[in-house]
Amino acid sequence: MRTDERRRWWVKPKKHITLVFITITMIIQFQMKGCVSCVETERMGLLQLKSYLKNLVDAEEEEEEGLSILKSWTHHEGDCCRWERVKCSDAINGHVIGLSLDRLVPVAFESQTRSLNLSLLHSFPQLQSLNLSWNWFTNLSDHFLGFKSFGTLDKLTTLDFSHNMFDNSIVPFLNAATSIRSLHLESNYMEGVFPPQELSNMTNLRVLNLKDNSFSFLSSQGLTDFRDLEVLDLSFNGVNDSEASHSLSTAKLKTLDLNFNPLSDFSQLKGLESLQELQVLKLRGNKFNHTLSTHVLKDLKMLQELDLSDNGFTNLDHGRGLEIPTSLQVLDFKRNQLSLTHEGYLGICRLMKLRELDLSSNALTSLPYCLGNLTHLRTLDLSNNQLNGNLSSFVSGLPSVLEYLSLLDNNFDGSFLFNSLVNQTRLTVFKLSSKVGVIQVQTESSWAPLFQLKMLYLSNCSLGSTMLGFLVHQRDLCFVDLSHNKLTGTFPTWLVKNNTRLQTILLSGNSLTKLQLPILVHGLQVLDISSNMIYDSIQEDIGMVFPNLRFMNFSSNHFQGTIPSSIGEMKSLQVLDMSSNGLYGQLPIMFLSGCYSLRVLKLSNNQLQGKIFSKHANLTGLVGLFLDGNNFTGSLEEGLLKSKNLTLLDISDNRFSGMLPLWIGRISRLSYLYMSGNQLKGPFPFLRQSPWVEVMDISHNSFSGSIPRNVNFPSLRELRLQNNEFTGLVPGNLFKAAGLEVLDLRNNNFSGKILNTIDQTSKLRILLLRNNSFQTYIPGKICQLSEVGLLDLSHNQFRGPIPSCFSKMSFGAEQNDRTMSLVADFDFSYITFLPHCQYGSHLNLDDGVRNGYQPKPATVVDFLTKSRYEAYQGDILRYMHGLDLSSNELSGEIPIEIGDLQNIRSLNLSSNRLTGSIPDSISKLKGLESLDLSNNKLDGSIPPALADLNSLGYLNISYNNLSGEIPFKGHLVTFDERSYIGNAHLCGLPTNKNCISQRVPEPPSVSTHAKEEENEEEGNVIDMVWFYWTCAAVYISTSLALFAFLYIDSRWSREWFYRVDLCVHHILQFKRSSVCN
């Protein structure tokens, strides 16, 4: 016993001594690390570098944008190892080994030169990592060492020059950086042949990122100089060389990214078999199509990941089979056109090591039951196809190790039993919805699943009461989407209580009637209950219960009352949408001062009032502000100046008055300005700094005066000035904006000449000049608007002929691939809301809240067609093409070239002085829906071919001098007499005039016919002198007879005068009663 006690006595002190020794060692190391201080020469070098970078930023721009470059780099702070963006070695005299200088300098225009002086880096001989991305440098320079500048940095291994504006001129400088192992040149302006010969000395490269440049050819020398290269990224270039894969051959290459190049044939990849160590091959977004021939991949024995998404494959090679190495673990076929049968699936089902498979966004119709044999499959995405069949049976046969299953947006119908997932013990993500019907989702009430979901998507389904019972067993949910499920009653507070890690809950498009919040504070980040039927007021303590909310959408409900002040406690809130409710009152000061992280604030279509943005406002992060459709009054206050990143401002349809304040021009990033429908007045808004303005809508106000001649909006895309009181000339500078697409000047008093500065590069698609005071000829230069789709020059005083060159204008004839930016006004795609519990995968899965939030609807354009104004927006606007020249003083004939506008849908030439006949070429306008030629001087007959215009929904050729029989056949039988009135010589249906009585027998000879015509003309001559004498005699005779009759018969005379007196009495009595009323 004593021996054991002595042993225990010795062991205890030994343990204590060991702990003490470890503690002392850690303290010494910590103190030594804390004593690290940088070398003085390097400290001074950093200060010189800061000074150089600051000089690249204009002092005024720095002040306005709030830039403060490298604030901690000062003379007062001696230890530069403590400075931001600086990393030092662990030695006592620490050398600078890392500089992270990304995103310091604001965006430069393409015409601006911004040089990086490499000699400033010579002070850091131990530098290992340098990041200068996102600074928009254009070139490198070194007046001391020239191209050999990087040679002094022989420890440099990582260099990041991505997202600048470098071109090939930097290549000789890079060739001296022989120690670099990782080089990033993504998103620059490099082009030509890859790899450039000048890079032959960079033999130590392991990682080379050239994404998003313009390399189009590959050197025949290939990658022989880069023998150790393991990762090569040439995505988003123009690589289309037929010998691409031969040039890329290098023994050690493990990852090859050729995403989004114009490769079109797998035969271009024959040399891939030499890449024996290749593990990752990415060919997304190329131009491969039709059947996939994979025999060129069969020798890649190490291949583990293959990305063939975003191509045009329609099928797999059945003859050879799917010759993909069995080592494959990740296969991505999403966004192709695959329509696989059972035999087509078999090739995939032979890949027994497959762990992740994405077949989403194809044309699949049959369920791939053979996937149940893939015992290692953990990720399966079949979303956005046309799958149908017995869903419960298919799901029950899937591998038990499955973790991720997406069946969103298919053609499933009927019921789905949730307990068919009984074999799935590891399932964490489940997604289900249908495009064609409502899926009845049910489960057994007693079933308790073995899995715990993290993400559940069940949108556009019908959840039974037992299904909600299933959710009670889930305690680890992070993301829940139950939108469009016909849910009723109260907001499911229990779902929030049971899942303490819940970050996102989407309940939009249901029929919830009450919002009841949990009592305890919760970490919820995304809450969407839009488009329900909630009539409550918003609880005052909502900001206390959900202080971590980042996204809050309460729009399209029936909320009443005021906005809670406690929302100001949501310090992380980025998007707040309470539009289309019944909220009233003023904006709380606590809300305006506390939500400094807010980027999107949408309060449209409520009953809010008062003045906005006093000095208390502190919305410094605001990017988009939507206050349209309220009752705000007064003028804008300067509190908005704190929102220096404000990009979109919409205050339309309020009661703002007075002049637009000059300070609004100091919001330098303002790109979208909507102020229509107020009571603003004064001259055209003067924006001092306006390089970014894309959309300006100040219509329906009382602005007056002329537009300054020197107005300059280089980025302008849409300008709306209609329904104001502007006068004077339209400045030519407006048309110099290269991207101008919409110009609406209707209902003003502009005059003078127009369009004198238009050139063939103009992208103008919508030009509306209705109801102004233009009095000139329509200039021929207007035909240079080759992309125009809607043109309205009506209700002016244009004179002269219609230009025949209108046929050169597209009106939809030239549909190019350029997306009409006017379809989507504003996109917050850079604001993402993905939960932290996002499923980990090598696939690019679409998880979380939608990646972009677009709170602004598509552009709306009103255009007169079918005798009424129609509103066109979104994709419909893309296909609407119309020409309106009505109510002018145009003369001459309708040019036959008008028939070349074959995609036009509305043509209005009414109320002019046009003569001649209706050209037969109009019958070529097969897409025409509205034709108005009324109130002109057109003559001749109606072309019979008009009956073949099957799309015509409105026809008006009234009040002309047309003659002959109406071709009442084909589509013209749908129009009644109103389309033809005012043409005295038209006959036939639908009029009541018979054409037979007006027909003249065919003359026997030319001389007889001429004689008949002469006699007819003589017989039709009226002697006007005899006509006047006859009328006078009849009038006098009738008057004498009336007076004699009344004089002779006294009874009739008394009755006559009685009736006259009675009529006068009734008139006087009616007049008195009207005055009294």
From Swiss-Prot:
Keyword Transmembrane (UniProt): yes
Residues carrying sugar: 117, 131, 139, 201, 240, 289, 373, 390, 423, 460, 498, 553, 618, 631, 645, 749, 771, 908, 956, 961
Coiled coil: none
UniProt topological domain (Extracellular) ranges: 39-1024
Keyword Membrane included in the entry's annotation: yes
Topology Cytoplasmic: residue spans: 1046-1077
Pfam family, one: LRRNT_2
Function: Involved in plant defense. Confers resistance to the bacterial pathogen Xanthomonas through recognition of the microbe-associated molecular pattern (MAMP) eMax. Functionality seems to depend on the presence of the receptor kinase SOBIR1 as an adapter protein.
Protein name, as recorded: Receptor-like protein 1
Organism: Arabidopsis thaliana (Mouse-ear cress)
Lineage, broadest ranks: Eukaryota, Viridiplantae, Streptophyta, Embryophyta, Tracheophyta
